[in-house]
Amino acid sequence: MRVIAYDRFRPGVTMQQITPYLPEEVSNVWRLWKAGIVRENYARADEPGVVIVFEVEDVAAARTYTDDFPLSKAGLLEWSFIALQVPLPIETLFREGLDLNPPFDRTTKHGEAAQ
């Protein structure tokens, strides 16, 4: 299962307080990425923080990892989680007779054979 985790600074926490922990924090996430546990990692564009996509069994497993992060142990972050699941076979939503053939190669002009 994929779990999206995103953090926020706890009220009153500043970037100055966060900065000393960043090398160890990044190293921790890097090791999880190399192990295939962290699938994606992004900096937030809307506010300071990160968004991490975990490949884990459930939210509790993702929380185990975030709780072990240096910034979490220091009590500087709050985490939120969104569990994702594979969508049902989308074809079940289509009406009978709808074209479900494989997509054509959109890099060629429609009707031309790819070379």
Task: Tell what function each PLM region has.
Residues 1-115:
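Conserved, structured core segments of small domains
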